[in-house]
From Swiss-Prot:
<dbReference type="Pfam" id="PF10298">
    <property type="entry name" value="WhiA_N"/>
</dbReference>
<dbReference type="Pfam" id="PF02650">
    <property type="entry name" value="HTH_WhiA"/>
</dbReference>
<dbReference type="InterPro" id="IPR018478">
    <property type="entry name" value="Sporu_reg_WhiA_N_dom"/>
</dbReference>
<protein>
    <recommendedName>
        <fullName>Probable cell division protein WhiA</fullName>
    </recommendedName>
</protein>
<keyword id="KW-0131">Cell cycle</keyword>
<dbReference type="InterPro" id="IPR003802">
    <property type="entry name" value="Sporulation_regulator_WhiA"/>
</dbReference>
<dbReference type="GO" id="GO:0043937">
    <property type="term" value="P:regulation of sporulation"/>
</dbReference>
<feature type="DNA-binding region" description="H-T-H motif">
    <location>
        <begin position="275"/>
        <end position="308"/>
    </location>
</feature>
<keyword id="KW-0238">DNA-binding</keyword>
<dbReference type="InterPro" id="IPR039518">
    <property type="entry name" value="WhiA_LAGLIDADG_dom"/>
</dbReference>
<dbReference type="Pfam" id="PF14527">
    <property type="entry name" value="LAGLIDADG_WhiA"/>
</dbReference>
<dbReference type="GO" id="GO:0051301">
    <property type="term" value="P:cell division"/>
</dbReference>
<dbReference type="GO" id="GO:0003677">
    <property type="term" value="F:DNA binding"/>
</dbReference>
<dbReference type="InterPro" id="IPR023054">
    <property type="entry name" value="Sporulation_regulator_WhiA_C"/>
</dbReference>
<comment type="function">
    <text>Involved in cell division and chromosome segregation.</text>
</comment>
<keyword id="KW-0132">Cell division</keyword>
<dbReference type="InterPro" id="IPR027434">
    <property type="entry name" value="Homing_endonucl"/>
</dbReference>
Amino acid sequence: MPLTSDVKEELSRVEVSKTTVRAAELATILRFSGGLHLISNRIAVESELDTPLLARRVRKDLAELYGVRSDISVIPASGMRRATHYLVRVMEGGETLARQTGLLDARRRPIRGLPNRLTTGSREEIAAVWRGAFLAAGTLTDPGRSAALEVTCPGNEAAMALVGAAGRLDVSAKAREVRGVHRVVIRDGDAIGQMLRVMGAQGTVVNWEEMRQRREVRATANRLVNFDDANLRRSAQAAVAACARVERAMEILGPDIPEHLKYAGDLRLRFRDSSLDELGHHADPPMTKDAVAGRIRRLLAMADKKAVDEGLPGTDANLPADLDDV
């Protein structure tokens, strides 16, 4: 997904000066991209990331914020894993780090959602939470009918916490579960743009909005074409029906047709594809479209009355069976 890669690269380069904001982003990345593991009776913190740039950012923050040393290993693409991933692991001091980042509670139990201090922090810290979640497990699809900014979550509690964090940023997000996988999704185009800006993807949001506008212009053009096609089809059907009924009216009335009504009927049959307005211009002297329509209407009414009186098929008898397909 090119858009996802663009967003993640830009977010991985966002410069943050406040320690609390950096810590909020890092803790969320660790929560959404890995977890706690027991290795040789020691708690290890692991984070599986999809770009080397993000892996360097995480290792830098681990060292500068918590003074811990981390190892990195490359997981090559294979089988279900479509791309190379980078595993950042903290073994020495892993439990202390887990406590400091809020991944472990006071009773040494792994948290189920997000650390409380993250979801109740400042707006800048909440934005960092979303930035971290997207860097760890987010995707952005192209603008269109199925456009979405989506984050895969480690569980329902984490998903609900992320929805609440979005609300703090005035962005509407929804949690959903599909085949046991919990996700938080933003589908509204304006909301997606707002979240991208809040997270710090200023460059990508410009490209995304341009793509969105182009899609909307194309969609509007297609709707107009379809609208015009439908109008043309209806006009063609109306012309065919009118000509068929006028022909039948001429048959029913024969020589009894008043001259002014016969003239209007002849106009209709001579210029079959013309509109009523155009028929009026063809008349000599010219007539208004209402005058033409009125004469044709009276011609048909007179013919239908005679058909009823004499037990004959009316003017509808000549209508083509496949009229709707015209």
